[in-house]
Every structure is written in C-alpha cells, then in structure tokens.
UniProtKB/Swiss-Prot annotation:
Residues annotated for FAD binding in this entry: 55, 79-81, 87, 157-159, 163
Pathway it works in: Pyrimidine metabolism; dTTP biosynthesis
Active-site residues from the entry: 168
PANTHER family: FLAVIN-DEPENDENT THYMIDYLATE SYNTHASE
Residue intervals of the ThyX domain: 1-202
Pfam families membership: Thy1
Cofactor: FAD
Designated gene of the protein: thyX
Entry-linked CDD domains: ThyX
Single GO MF annotation: flavin adenine dinucleotide binding
Protein name: Flavin-dependent thymidylate synthase
Enzyme Commission number(s) from the entry: 2.1.1.148
C-alpha cells in the first residue's frame, strides 16, 4: 500500500488555535491572527483536545491518496462518514494484468496462499470470460474478489481524523485498516505535529480527558494509566503493550507485512 498526504490546510494549526481563542474573546480574527504566538498555538490546541472542544479542529482539512489496498479495507474506510471519497471504479478501470494485484492477508500467507492465489486467478479469468460473452463491465465485476486492489482519494478534517485514529489505530482494528491509519497518522504529524501530538487510539484520547497533563503515544512506556481499563476491556496495566502491538503493523508498497 502507498499512503500520501497530497494536500492540506497549510496554516491549519494556527487556524485551529485562533478559532478556539475567538470563541472566548470579543476581539476579531485580525487581532488574534496578529497577536497569536507559537506557544499560544500549542496551548489552545492542547486545551481544545483535552476538553473535548472538537469543533475547532474541523477548520483544518487533509487529502490523502491511498493506493494498493483491498476492497475490504476501502469498505471499512468509507464507513467514516464525515469525509469525502473518490474511489477507482472497476466499471471503467478494468483489472488488466499488471494492475491486478489482490491483497493477501498475512494469516493466509502462512496457511493457505496457494488456495487464495488460485481463487484470485480464477476470478480474474471469469471476469474476462464474462466480458467475452458480452456481459458489461459493471456486471462482470461481480465476480471479482473482496481482496481486489483499489485506489481511493480521501479528504477528512482534523476532527474526523481524531475519531478515525481513535478507532482504527487500536489493536482491535483489522490489520489492513490499522496499517492505513498508522501511515495516515505519520503523514499528518509530519506537517502538523502540534495538532496531532495527542492523536492515538481511544485509550489515549479517553485517558487525556481525566489527566491534568495529557500524554502522547511517545509517553506510553513511562505512563501509569488512571483509567482502570480501556473501552475495549484492556486493563490499564495491559494498555501500553496493547498499543505497541497495534503500532507494530507496517505494510510496504508491494503489500508485504512487516514489523515496525
């Protein structure tokens, strides 16, 4: 898989901070835009996130190109409804040889790869047999597998990304959507480290609601959690290990699953 942040709100961190401050001030945009310091930006972002003041994060927007994932993963992705999606259509983009690279889960790589390889090849052959019989592409594609590779353009604002990360960075998320989420997090932290400093699975988000000083993913090894257990039932003693296990997923551009 290949995940790339292709566009984003360049001044997103500053915009979020100014919006947060304006909600508590009688002064307008020009004043706060001129007077806002870098330290204030970090403070307003942190306080907005730890107090659940999520609406200000909606002002910063991000567009990703996500390539070489399965239809299984893309179907999970589009369940996050506060977003915009444009996906490759197998009605118009037929799976010709060099572009037909269905995704094989790591559990199958070790147990039944030959079975899946045959199923994928059979589906490919059946697709073209149907086309030869005059079946239109929009109907012939019904025989293509859930694992067929696809590309999708995704646009989310920072608030929805926090919600997406909370659910999909978690070890309970399926491996492929989890790998997508961790790569997307890496991309947004590269351009907006302050805005996504406190992003993480829901165990991190919910913990920060009750802590005086919020924690980050980098603090996980040195943190004693206040929460007795996360919403998935993992005890506070087990949360650090659970997060590290979730973070260990890494998938190369050619689909090889590796440790991180």
């Amino acid at each position: 898989m290949k995940i790339k942040l292709v566009s984003y709100s360049k001044d997103g961190e500053r915009i979020v901070a100014i919006a947060a401050k304006m909600s508590r001030s009688r002064k307008g945009w020009d004043y706060h835009e001129k007077e806002m310091t870098d330290d204030e930006i970090e403070t307003w972002i942190r306080d907005s996130i730890t107090h659940g003041y999520w609406s200000v994060l909606e002002h910063s927007v991000y567009t990703f190109s996500i390539e070489g994932i399965s239809r299984v993963a893309s179907h999970q992705l589009v369940r996050h409804r506060i977003a915009s999606y444009t996906q490759m259509s197998h009605r118009f983009a037929k799976p010709v040889d060099k572009y037909y690279k269905p995704i094989t889960p790591p559990s199958i790589e070790k147990r039944g790869k030959e079975v899946v390889d045959k199923a994928y090849q059979d589906a490919y052959n059946y697709f073209y047999q149907l086309l030869e019989k005059g079946v239109p592409e929009e109907d012939a594609r019904y025989v293509l597998p859930n694992g067929v590779n696809t590309n999708i353009v995704v646009t989310m604002n920072a608030r929805e990304l926090y919600n997406f990360f909370g659910l999909r960075l978690c070890s309970r998320a399926q491996w492929e959507i989890r790998a997508i989420a961790w790569k997307m997090l890496d991309e947004v932290k590269r351009v907006h480290p302050r805005l996504f400093k406190y992003a993480g699975p829901n165990c991190i988000i919910h913990e920060n609601f009750i802590r005086e000083n919020p924690i980050t993913l980098d603090d996980i090894d040195n943190t004693v959690f206040i929460s007795q257990r996360c919403i998935e039932g993992v005890t506070r003693e087990g949360i650090p290990k659970c997060v590290k296990n979730a973070r260990s997923i890494l998938v190369s551009e050619d689909g090889v699953v590796m440790g991180k």
